[in-house]
Regions:
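Conserved GNAT-fold acetyl-CoA-binding loop/helix
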Residues: 23-51
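Conserved acetyl-CoA-binding loop of GNAT-fold acetyltransferases
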Residues: 125-135
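Short glycine/proline-centered loop/turn elements that form peptide/ligand docking sites
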Residues: 92, 96, 117-120, 137-143
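Conserved GNAT acetyl-CoA-binding A-motif
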Residues: 103-115
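A short, internal acetyl-CoA/4′-phosphopantetheine-binding micro-motif in the GNAT/acyltransferase core
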Residues: 80-87, 114-115
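Conserved acetyl-CoA-binding loop-helix of GNAT-fold acetyltransferases
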Residues: 88-101, 122, 126
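Conserved beta-strand in the GNAT
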Residues: 55, 61-69, 74-81
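A short beta-loop-alpha structural element at the N-terminal edge
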Residues: 5-20
């Protein structure tokens, strides 16, 4: 797939975009998991480790969020959200494959968590992520080519 995916560091100017994105991509899953969907809870999730937030640009338009911590092993994908209007185009898969290649080159694993009600877990499994734990609401997944 020939995609023009770029990233830029998220800033305070992106908060409204990120609130809207999070509402569109996650509220259904939070509701299904009996987790709060009010604005304050959503803002708290947007601001969580905000210094690691990157706006995903597709053809120079903001289409999502990648929050990632590359500082340790495993590399942790904290949040990956693609606007529903851009889903199904392979963007998430392309982004994750790039992260997996980066991790492989660095000799690191990759971890993430996914709500049990979120169908994205099928994408993660198809890329080789394995569930290594769970809690009431989420699966904790890991990828390693070692």
């Amino acid at each position: 797939m020939n995609t023009e995916i770029h990233y830029r560091k998220a800033s305070e100017n992106d908060i409204d975009f990120l609130l809207d994105l999070r509402t569109k991509t996650m509220n259904e899953h939070y509701t299904n998991s009996s987790l709060p969907t009010d604005r304050a809870s959503t803002l708290q999730r947007v601001l969580y480790q905000f210094e690691k937030a990157n706006i995903i640009l597709f053809n120079n338009e903001p289409v999502g969020l990648l929050k990632i911590d590359r500082s340790k092993d495993p590399i942790e994908v904290l949040q990956l959200q693609i606007d529903p209007g851009q889903q199904g185009k392979g963007l998430g898969k392309t982004i994750l494959q790039s992260i997996l290649e980066e991790a492989s080159s660095a000799g690191k694993k990759v971890s993430l968590s996914v709500l049990k009600s979120n169908k994205a877990q099928h994408l993660y499994s198809s890329l080789g992520f394995k569930a290594v734990g769970e809690d009431e609401h989420s699966y904790f997944m890991s990828f390693s080519d070692r």
